[in-house]
Amino acid sequence: MTHDLAASGLRFGIEEEFFLLDASDLDIVRSAPAGFVAACRDTLGEHFAEEMFECQVEVASPVFSTLAEAARFHGQARQRLAHLAMDFGLRSLCVGTHPFADWRRARSNPAAHFARLFEDQGRVARRSLVCGLHVHVEIPPSHDRMAVLQRVLPWLPLLLALSASSPFRGGRRSGLASYRRALCGEWPRMNIPPALPDEDAYRRHLALLRETGCIREDGQVWWMIRPSSHVPTLELRICDACPRLADALSLAGLFRALVGEALDADPRALPVARDACLEENYWQALRYGCAGRYLVEGRCVGAGDWLEMAWRQCRPQARRGNEWAYQHACGLLEETSAARQLRRYRRLREAGQERHPALRRLVEELLEENLQPALAG
């Protein structure tokens, strides 16, 4: 298979979150060992960040022009983080939810920024032991980010369905493809953004939230897609963390293509309007993943047809540099991470393994997937 990675798309960046596990039992650690965070900063530099729990870290990329650049950086970053973790008796795991970890064991990060989150959100924050994939796509200054957001928004449940990797919670099947997004729904300002027509309206809304004490800072608006508060991008936040790097790259490419199409669209021909079916499609993606039934253009379609519709509506300039992303996503329709985890778990139980050993083996397989090369061939 050859991969078209022409460097002519919008610039973008990717953020991946990881759990830190005890190498001996593959459960989350309460705290990282002394020296681990410093070693990560020495190795990954400004691209490494701590997260809201001490058993979590994040890798945030530089700015990319091509998916090939993203594959090289994140492939190396995953390897480096994994090797550092092993040096400290840990393993690093990229997945939406840990299959058997108990969230009550997770220790909150005492840094002031995170302490305020736990103070404000209480048990909602404590329960949110999840990892996500965030993708930033640069928006030219000549375009209004909120207008672009509203045009891209109806497609986001499709991206969630493709990314779903959190079917387990606390050692049990959750019944959802993305339990992570169900937990996100407990937070304020973390689901579907309001129908604000432009950035002026967005800024007025943020000012109201600040002035009334609803938020402490602009970054506390955590919608599933939002204008970044510090860089000129739209930030996709709906997706689960992807065990396989290739899946994360595919989602980044699809999002970049959809944003590119929204930028190129004639605003007179594409009015900003809220899709009445958005909430139902979001539930279908959260519950069923790619097996969901989606309401699109007045009819019910499967995820495969919806993905084809998304790609068809992107003009050549929006597709350019993202062709591989679409091809890979077509393969994801056959089996997402959530579906694969459930299939493997079922296979292990049918072979006679007890619940916990089967879940531990599932974590071992996810760790192996984390280090699979992307864009090979």
UniProtKB/Swiss-Prot annotation:
Pfam families linked: GCS2
What biological-process GO terms show up in the record? Answer: modified amino acid biosynthetic process
Alphabetical UniProt keywords: ATP-binding, Ligase, Nucleotide-binding
- Which domain of life does the protein's organism represent? Bacteria
What GO molecular functions are on record for this protein?
ATP binding; glutamate-cysteine ligase activity
InterPro entries tied to this protein: GCL_type2/YbdK_subfam (IPR050141), GCS2 (IPR006336), Gln_synth/guanido_kin_cat_dom (IPR014746), YbdK (IPR011793)
Q: Known EC number(s)? A: 6.3.2.2
Catalysed reaction equations from the record:
L-cysteine + L-glutamate + ATP = gamma-L-glutamyl-L-cysteine + ADP + phosphate + H(+)
Concerning its family, UniProt says:
Belongs to the glutamate--cysteine ligase type 2 family. YbdK subfamily.
The cross-references to PANTHER family, in alphabetical order and at most eight, read: GLUTAMATE--CYSTEINE LIGASE 2-RELATED
**What is the recorded function of this protein according to its Swiss-Prot or TrEMBL entry?**
ATP-dependent carboxylate-amine ligase which exhibits weak glutamate--cysteine ligase activity.
Tell me what this protein is called. Answer: Putative glutamate--cysteine ligase 2
Native organism taxonomy: Bacteria, Pseudomonadati, Pseudomonadota, Gammaproteobacteria, Pseudomonadales
